[in-house]
Amino acid sequence: KEGFILDVLEYYITYPTYFKLVQTAYEDNSYSKDKSMKVLKKYVEQHPHSIKKKTAIMLNHFMSSTIKKIDNKAKAMLVTSSRKEAVLYKPEFDRQIKENNFNIKTLVAFTSTIKLDGLEYTESNMNKIEGKKSIKEAFKEDAFKILIVANKFQTGFDEPLLHTMYVDKKLSGVAAVQTLSRVNRIAPNKTSTLIIDFVNKKEEIREAFEPYYTETYLTGKTDYHKLYDLMENIYDFDLF
């Protein structure tokens, strides 16, 4: 049981670490001339604040790395802090997907109806899923690659093809354990997971897991030799 959860934490990185990873790789002669690295360098910023900028970072990471995992079947989840944030993220993802001619679709999950700038938003009118399929059923389709959630599917959601999680929400205690564990389901040829956290600190996540597990991978300072190993897992340079 421990190892099952530790696999989740093995490839957990905070956004500042991800930023340093890209910066370090870009300065390395082995990678600096690679086109995909130049694209990632363009979008990665030290302190991204706007939804537009964070969407660009996540989407370009997904298209440069995650999409090729699990025999090109891998999916991602974005955990947002509120229904409003989820409603704002969904059209921005869709806009950038269309702008870049990426052949993927997104889904958004939140409860009830939210009013924003005089308009009412629901899962139904934002997702426009054909037929009577649920979000869980639709997400199993190959076209739907990214699921944006607000206080939904953070517990009890079982999707083996979920490889990457982007976290833009404060997490603590058992909620952190339950949320991050969404990516730990086993699937054929699924050999890794990845969590990029924009909000929480490494120490906070370690503390959340400690009451339940005797050890974690989130200890000590960043070892850049390990980061290079992680980089090989994160980036597949033949995409662009």
Q: At which residue positions do the language-model features occur?
A:
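RecA-like P-loop NTPase motor core of helicase/translocase proteins
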Residues: 1-240
